[in-house]
């Protein structure tokens, strides 16, 4: 269970970072200070870093759709999939909420 807890924290942090940096780049772009290439680079860099950092802990899934696909294909168990999806969703929501305020 300890490794599942670490994986959940890793997925929470990775998904939080992706949403916070990615959506933050979109917000900056909407003010005219960043173009589409900058938004794409922000998403690409944060995703590359988060997958690299969390890959050995949780698999670097970062996206509930990826987790659902792996669960559906039988590559991860139901308990692990459910915990990681919840962690990813909470990370995404908190990342977006932090940008809002």
Predicted regions and their residues:
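Membrane-interface helix-loop junctions and terminal tails of multi-pass membrane proteins
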Residues: 1-101
């Amino acid at each position: 269970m300890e490794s599942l807890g670490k994986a959940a924290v890793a997925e929470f942090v990775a998904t939080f970072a992706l949403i916070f940096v990615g959506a933050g780049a979109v917000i900056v772009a909407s003010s005219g200070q960043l173009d589409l290439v900058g938004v794409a680079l922000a998403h690409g860099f944060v995703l590359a870093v988060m997958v690299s950092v969390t890959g050995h802990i949780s698999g670097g899934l970062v996206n509930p759709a990826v987790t659902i696909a792996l669960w559906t294909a039988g590559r991860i168990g139901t308990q692990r999939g459910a915990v990681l999806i919840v962690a990813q969703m909470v990370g995404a929501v908190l990342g977006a909420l932090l940008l809002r305020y």
